[in-house]
Amino acid sequence: NETTRDIVQAELLGSPDDPDAFGSGSIPLSRIIKTERKPGVPNAKSVALIKHVSGGNSSLHFKSYDMGQEKWQGRSVDVVWLDEEPGRDIYSQAVTRTLDRRGMVYMTYTPEAGMTETTSSFINRLQKGQSLTNATWDDASEKISSMKGENGHLSEAVMEQILSAYS
């Protein structure tokens, strides 16, 4: 759907709105072998074939939660990236799809819905093989991060602007 295209696809392949930006995401153009268009969603991809650093190829499959868990079933995969909190049915499918390959499931989200079952399981009941990275406001700050030898991405002026929008 549009959200998958505008967030995950854009991060990995480059802005879907600008043909010249294709290959400017986390995956460089030189590694993108081919893509398949997603029917019904302008500028969206359903699959991308990527030249892996190992010499083999990896296929990326872009799915959205609104497709339902049935569309997530069957295929064994190495990695699943869940952007925004999934329902338990999708999360369970993601874990199941990676089991036989000893793969990984990444989730990146702000717990907008509060202490859901998924959020609680990571905050209160972290299991062996799981990890939780808690990104804080200070982690985003250029000033505070630079004092720790890290790279934040928000200037003080931008942070003040964001905070004032919530006041």
Regions found by a protein language model. Name each.
Residues 1-167:
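Phosphate/NTP-binding elements of NTP-utilizing enzymes
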